[in-house]
Amino acid sequence: MLQDIAETAGQDEETKLQVINTFFNRRVLYRDDWETWGVADYWASPLETLSKGQGDCEDYAIGKYFSLIAAGIPSVKMRMVYVRAQVGGVIQAHMVLAYYPQPNAEPLILDNLVTDIRPASRRPDLVPVFSFNAEGLWQGVSGSSAGDPSARLSRWRDVFAKAKAEGWW
């Protein structure tokens, strides 16, 4: 992974997105938290996910988020987005990573269900519920601020601390 990040040095942000998105989508096998960790819901750090070689949707999004920070993309350009995803005929909870090239731009969606990066408008299967990053928590993707994510999302606070201890920035 570190080699993949290092190879993006000097590359534009779109290239960094492609490299990191492809890396996680190819190297991590989808498994739910019961299969991987023996609990209903666990947010793994990037190194935990990579050491297991498997994870669920949050683990893909978390790995991509911290890898892109390590590659030089500011966290303010990214948000973890909790969505309702239509998979087949079923609506299910899901997590993706949104990248904003400019503050008010349409985000690009990095996902493990759809391997290519697409603008949010080309993902009608996703309905955003809330989004967050190191700087804030929002209703939907562009809604009003809902406060400090570390105070409201204990799993985010925990994985953020683990990623920092692992040296992701």
Model-derived regions, located:
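A structural boundary/capping signal
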Residues: 1-169
